[in-house]
C-alpha cells in the first residue's frame, strides 16, 4: 500500500480487507512510529516522505476521520483502542478550549494546539458524540456493522432492552451508558462485559455469523 495517509487505511471500514491486511492496518494505526501520536491519529503516517511537521493535512490531527476509525475499532472488538481514540480527542479538545475558548479546525501534532480556522464548529460533532458514547446515560453506540433495530430505556436510564442486527461475523463491541450502579447483563449470544467506569458497559461479542442479538441490562 503506497498510500500512507488515512485513506490508505479506509478499507477497514469499507469491509474490503483480508484478515492479514486488517491485522497490519490496525498495527499501523496503533503504532507511535506510524499513525498514532500523542494527540490522536495523524492524517499521514509519520514515517511517510511527505509527512510535514507544519502540514495542514499532511501532518495534523482532525476529528471527523478519527470518528470513522473509532467506529471501526468497535467493529473489530478493539475496545481499548476505541477508548484511546475517544479519550485522547476529548482531552485534547478540552485543553484547547480551556486555553483559547476557540473551536479549531484541526490540531498540530508537535504543539498539541488548535490550528486553522478558530470558529470551525462543524468539526466538533465527533467530540459531542464521543462524550455521549462514554458519559451520557441513555446512549447506545455501535460500530458500522451493527444496526440498532430497537431500544427500550427506562425513564431514568437505569435499564435497557435492545435488539441489534450484526451484519458481519467476528468480534464486535457495543457501548451502553446507563445510570451508575451495579448492573446485570443478559444477551442471546455469549458476550464479555467490562466496566470502564461506573455506568459504562462495554459488551464484546464473538459472532460466528451475521445474526440478530437481544440485550437486557438491568440493576
Regions found by a protein language model. Name each.
Residues 165-181:
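Surface-exposed beta-strand/loop patches in extracellular or lumenal glycoproteins
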Residues 31-39:
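Mobile, glycine-enriched helix-loop/loop "lid" segments at the mouths of ligand-binding/catalytic clefts
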Residues 196-219:
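C-terminal beta-strand-rich structural cap/linker in extracellular carbohydrate-active enzymes
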Residues 189-195:
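Surface-exposed loop/edge segments in extracytoplasmic proteins
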Residues 38-62:
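Generic long, charged, amphipathic alpha-helical segments
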Residues 158-166:
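Short, well-ordered beta-strand segments enriched in hydrophobic/aromatic residues
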Residues 1-32, 55-157:
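C-terminal capping/lid segments that line or modulate ligand- or cofactor-binding pockets
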Amino acid at each position: 500500500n503506497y498510500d500512507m495517509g488515512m485513506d490508505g487505511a479506509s478499507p477497514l471500514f469499507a469491509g474490503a480487507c483480508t484478515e492479514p491486511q486488517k491485522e497490519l492496518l490496525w498495527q499501523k494505526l496503533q503504532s507511535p512510529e506510524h499513525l498514532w501520536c500523542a494527540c490522536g491519529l495523524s492524517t499521514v503516517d509519520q514515517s511517510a516522505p511527505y509527512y510535514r511537521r507544519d502540514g495542514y493535512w499532511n501532518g495534523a490531527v482532525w476529528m471527523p476521520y478519527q470518528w470513522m476509525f473509532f467506529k471501526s475499532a468497535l467493529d473489530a472488538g478493539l475496545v481499548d483502542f476505541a477508548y484511546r481514540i475517544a479519550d485522547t480527542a476529548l482531552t485534547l479538545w478540552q485543553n484547547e478550549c480551556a486555553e483559547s475558548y476557540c473551536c479549531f479546525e484541526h490540531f498540530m501534532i508537535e504543539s498539541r494546539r488548535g490550528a486553522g480556522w478558530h470558529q470551525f464548529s462543524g468539526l466538533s460533532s465527533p467530540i459531542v458524540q464521543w462524550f455521549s458514547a462514554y458519559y451520557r446515560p441513555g446512549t447506545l453506540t455501535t460500530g458500522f456493522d451493527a444496526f440498532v433495530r430497537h431500544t427500550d430505556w427506562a425513564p431514568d436510564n437505569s435499564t435497557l432492552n435492545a435488539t441489534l442486527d450484526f451484519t458481519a461475523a467476528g468480534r464486535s463491541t457495543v457501548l451502553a451508558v446507563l445510570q451508575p450502579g451495579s448492573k446485570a447483563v443478559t444477551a442471546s449470544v455469549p458476550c464479555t462485559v467490562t466496566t470502564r467506569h461506573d455506568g459504562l458497559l462495554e459488551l464484546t461479542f464473538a459472532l460466528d455469523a451475521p445474526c440478530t442479538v437481544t440485550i437486557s441490562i438491568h440493576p
